């Protein structure tokens, strides 16, 4: 991995549910603890009370499901009901990691793709050398878990 490359990955799961129903679950960040293996709660910040471009929320993370535990501040970067929802994990005023959900009608249901993109940074190459490649694999596995948990809820009714 070069220093100017991003680390990224994605997972897709088909859900026998409408895109609007899936989007409503995903875009309500209060639900994140029900689905994510690492983020166990989230709350809107400031005047934000729901999904909107530029809205901020805080996510409470238990890294690798065991720790360390920390808060992240996130900003909504994509918000189109029934189609996409995305947010950036902020490091100060800079997006460090971007998470995105894209919903596409398919076979009477919805294909839901979750992706992440860790922004290029000088430290990323060093991180990769010291095990960052394992993080990519972990993220893809956790995105698949997250999507399957969402699938279980939307298909149950």
Show which residues each predicted segment covers.
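Hydrophobic ligand-binding cavity/cleft-lining segments
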Residues: 1-49, 149
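Residues that form or flank phosphate/diphosphate-binding pockets in enzymes
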Residues: 17, 52, 67, 95-98, ...
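Amphipathic alpha-helical protein-protein interaction surfaces
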Residues: 18, 28-31, 81, 108, ...
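Short, solvent-exposed helix-to-loop capping segments enriched in aromatics
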Residues: 24-37, 54-66, 138
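Glycine-rich portal/gate segments that line the openings of hydrophobic small-molecule binding cavities
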Residues: 43-94, 106-111, 145-157
């Amino acid at each position: 991995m070069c220093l100017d490359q991003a680390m990224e990955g994605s997972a897709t799961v088909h859900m026998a549910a409408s895109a609007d129903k899936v989007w409503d679950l995903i875009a309500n960040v209060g639900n994140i603890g029900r689905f994510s293996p690492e983020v166990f709660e989230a709350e809107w910040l400031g005047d934000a009370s729901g999904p909107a471009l530029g809205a901020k929320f805080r996510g409470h993370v238990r890294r690798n499901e065991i720790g360390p535990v920390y808060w992240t501040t996130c900003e909504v970067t994509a918000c189109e009901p029934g189609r996409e929802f995305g947010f950036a994990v902020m490091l100060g005023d800079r997006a460090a990691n971007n998470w995105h959900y894209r919903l596409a009608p398919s076979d009477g249901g919805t294909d839901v793709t979750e992706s992440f993109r860790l922004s290029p940074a000088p430290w990323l190459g060093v991180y990769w050398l010291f095990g960052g490649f394992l993080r990519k694999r972990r993220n893809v596995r956790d995105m698949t878990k997250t999507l399957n948990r969402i699938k279980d809820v939307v298909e149950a009714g």
